[in-house]
């Protein structure tokens, strides 16, 4: 059985070495993996509208489509920088893109995965923003704007929220993460995988926090026997 691979936040922003390295990594997965889960925030901002694709995004999206044609399942966890991605890309670049987590049953394990941006129940400002920015009325008004205005608006709104998010992630909130993951483990899952925090952690062999890929060049690998380990990403 080929591996199941979880990839943490990548935050690709433009053409360059990081983009080329990531595309090469995805290409290598065709020979080693059967399933890929992207844990959200693949780009600095990803909007579910094909007419807003920037060149670097188009190249990654084309590579994901290629992986699916090769027979790999590609699943996506919408993160705090993703806006209705599933509506535009499920069926082409992605198999699915659930907003509230997904379950992978692999190697005899039930693995629950979710981006993790809602782990901090005390961050009410962010929770309010998340609901507002993804609501149907806001999305409808946003779609009515010309593409350039839409991109400029998203960039400004994201910049205004970075301070709150940065404060929360300045130090890894281990107890918050443990409590958050415990709720999913209590449902009968064997392991929980989170992105969002940009650090690599394996807590008690059951809770795995994915490193930010662009800096670490590492990912979480699940073998056919259910063994879970962080490994260097081949290029």
Language-model segments: residues:
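Short, low-complexity, intrinsically disordered N-terminal peptides in bacterial proteins
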Residues: 1-3, 167, 171, 234-235
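Short, charged N-terminal helix-start/capping segments
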Residues: 1-17, 113-128
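Core catalytic region of metal-dependent phosphoesterases/phosphodiesterases
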Residues: 2-7, 12-106
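Active-site metal-binding loops of divalent metal-dependent hydrolases
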Residues: 8-11, 41-42, 80-81, 116-117, ...
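Glycine-rich loops and low-complexity Gly/Arg-rich segments
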Residues: 29-33, 60-64, 100-103, 136-140, ...
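N-terminal short leaders/motifs
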Residues: 44-67, 146-149, 159-187
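Conserved beta-sheet core of the metallophosphoesterase superfamily
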Residues: 92-100, 110-112, 117, 121-129, ...
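Active-site-proximal loop/helix segment associated with metal-binding centers of metalloenzymes
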Residues: 116-176
